[in-house]
């Protein structure tokens, strides 16, 4: 048995992108007995599992065990089920309903998708309030009491019938209700985490054999699980983040701890100049599946580009000038540049590309005539650049303004066309990036640690890949390049974009590697890691 603890919660917008879920899907497809374990309150768990595309995957939630919830499915509470008391007037505002009595707010209902009840807050005359949080199976899962200052006074977890099981006080101490005492080892706990660990341990002990447990490095429960449950586990496996490591995983307390990285680049970045330890492994959570996109059309010259980070200012400027010159030299190329708006390096690179455009063409994007032209183009989607210029000539003449010279008209049109072929996407969603790759000809990731999921999608789509960080899927010079220097990008790109023979060779290699990185081969790697069959 494998227990997987995903790292998404009630607020996660895209649980389908969770690494633990990706691994669970591989296990499910290969009949590995697996269960998702959730160690935190999760009133909308069924909703999130549906979003994650695993609605019927076996799961266990510790709070169901705590609250004695005997069923997995149910019908959510909806707005029409909320009673309307006499003398109370409701007001709707998209996902919120406010109820007033004689001008005083007495109840607030917060909704999901305009009709599913998430919580109801009741207000008394003194400003104190009680909030009932609803499970998406239709019952109140916990109740919170707050004073007029908004401070939590106590919180109770309830059975589906509405009986309190546990009550947490303002000092975090948790008291077990007498009626439920026999299900717990203590009448009082220091905090709710102690109860959670007790119930997870009990659940593990009901299994026929010690399970392997897979957790994500940045899961807030990681230390608690390893501190308290290590003796109950056959093996603990940590899915390491690609970047932004929150802790030193090597210091985690477990004798049989394994670290799994999504790529060689991620592992190398984590260990730096040190030799990777024997308990560190590279297994992609994303299987490759052959699904060729539009990239096999020679006319399609879309390049999906992840801009670089960690470059010196001089190198950033040089790279930007290189990208600009490539686009200026080949009017068929289109670059979709994905940047993290919080990365100064990537934002700077974007700005330097624009500066290089203006320097080459001789006009800035802040030029008054250019801005008028661009805004007119946006309003006239079906018109050509020449048509819009003719229109502006007429408008300028009517307004007795100095006409735009032929030379400047050419500069404006050239600047506009370049801007249309260098499309900057600020912090695009993973879904958006995966969609772009399916329509691209080459995938370029200039970041120090490339994204494993994007790499797997590029392989599945048949694209050549060009990266700076190590790439498990690249056979150097055949289906891609791992660059020693980002400045080598122009030669690497033209190798695939300007020579159909090279592009076809890359496609053949990608098809071969899709089999190599299939679900079957991934599960073989996982089984080897967990010592199955020994």
Predicted segment positions?
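Short acidic alpha-helix that forms the nucleotide-activated donor recognition element
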Residues: 429-440
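Catalytic binding pocket for nucleotide-activated donors in carbohydrate/polymer assembly enzymes
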Residues: 447-508, 512
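Conserved catalytic-core segment of nucleotide-activated headgroup transferases in glycan assembly
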Residues: 288-404
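A short, active-site helix/loop in glycosyltransferases that binds the activated sugar's phosphate group
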Residues: 253-279
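A charged, aromatic-enriched C-terminal amphipathic alpha-helix characteristic of glycosyltransferases
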Residues: 501-531
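Active-site donor-binding acidic/aromatic loop of nucleotide-activated sugar
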Residues: 419-429
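N-terminal subdomain of nucleotide-sugar transferases
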Residues: 1-83
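Repetitive, compositionally biased segments used for assembly/scaffolding
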Residues: 75-194, 198
């Amino acid at each position: 048995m494998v227990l997987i603890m995903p790292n998404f919660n009630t607020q996660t917008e895209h649980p389908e992108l969770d690494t633990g879920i990706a691994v669970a899907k591989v296990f499910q497809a290969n009949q590995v007995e697996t269960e998702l374990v959730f160690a935190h309150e999760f009133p909308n768990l069924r909703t999130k599992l549906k979003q994650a595309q695993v609605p019927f995957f076996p799961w266990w939630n510790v709070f169901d065990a705590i609250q004695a919830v005997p069923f997995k499915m149910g019908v959510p509470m909806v707005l029409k089920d909320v009673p309307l008391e006499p003398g109370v007037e409701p007001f709707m505002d998209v996902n919120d309903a406010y109820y007033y009595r004689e001008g005083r707010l007495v109840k607030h209902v917060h909704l999901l998708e305009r009709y599913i009840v998430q919580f109801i807050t009741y207000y008394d005359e003194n400003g104190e309030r009680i909030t009932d949080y609803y499970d998406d199976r239709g019952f109140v899962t916990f109740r919170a009491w707050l004073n007029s200052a908004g401070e939590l006074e106590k919180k109770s977890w309830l059975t589906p019938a509405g009986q309190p099981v546990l009550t947490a006080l303002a000092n975090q101490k948790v008291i077990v209700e007498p009626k439920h005492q026999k299900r717990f080892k203590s009448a009082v706990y220091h905090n709710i985490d102690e109860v959670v660990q007790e119930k997870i341990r009990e659940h593990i002990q009901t299994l026929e054999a010690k399970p392997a447990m897979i957790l994500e490095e940045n899961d807030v429960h990681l230390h608690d699980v390893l501190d308290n449950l290590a003796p109950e586990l056959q093996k603990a496996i940590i899915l390491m983040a690609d970047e932004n490591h929150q802790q030193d995983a090597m210091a985690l307390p477990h004798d049989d701890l394994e670290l799994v990285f999504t790529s060689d680049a991620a592992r190398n970045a984590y260990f730096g100049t040190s030799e990777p330890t024997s308990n560190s492994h590279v297994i992609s959570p994303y299987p490759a599946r052959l699904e060729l996109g539009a990239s096999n059309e020679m006319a399609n010259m879309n390049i999906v580009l992840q801009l670089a980070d960690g470059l010196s200012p001089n190198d950033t400027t040089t790279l930007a000038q290189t990208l600009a010159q490539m686009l200026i030299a080949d009017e068929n190329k289109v670059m979709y540049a994905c940047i993290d708006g919080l990365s100064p390096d990537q934002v700077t690179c974007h700005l330097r590309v624009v500066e290089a455009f203006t320097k080459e063409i001789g006009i800035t994007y802040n030029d008054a005539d250019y801005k008028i032209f661009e805004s007119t183009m946006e309003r006239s989607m079906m018109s050509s650049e020449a048509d819009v210029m003719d229109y502006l000539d007429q408008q300028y003449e009517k307004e007795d303004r100095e006409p735009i010279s032929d030379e400047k008209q050419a500069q404006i049109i050239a600047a506009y066309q370049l801007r249309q072929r260098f499309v900057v996407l600020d912090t695009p969603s993973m879904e958006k990036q995966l969609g772009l790759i399916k329509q691209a000809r080459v995938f370029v990731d200039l970041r120090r640690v490339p994204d494993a999921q994007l790499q797997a999608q590029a392989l599945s789509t048949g694209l050549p890949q060009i990266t700076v960080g190590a790439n498990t899927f690249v056979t150097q010079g055949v289906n891609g390049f791992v660059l020693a220097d980002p400045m080598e990008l122009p030669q690497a790109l033209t190798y695939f974009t300007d020579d159909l023979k090279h592009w076809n060779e890359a496609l053949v290699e990608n098809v071969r590697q899709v089999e190599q990185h299939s679900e079957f081969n991934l599960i073989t790697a996982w089984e080897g890691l967990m010592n199955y069959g020994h």
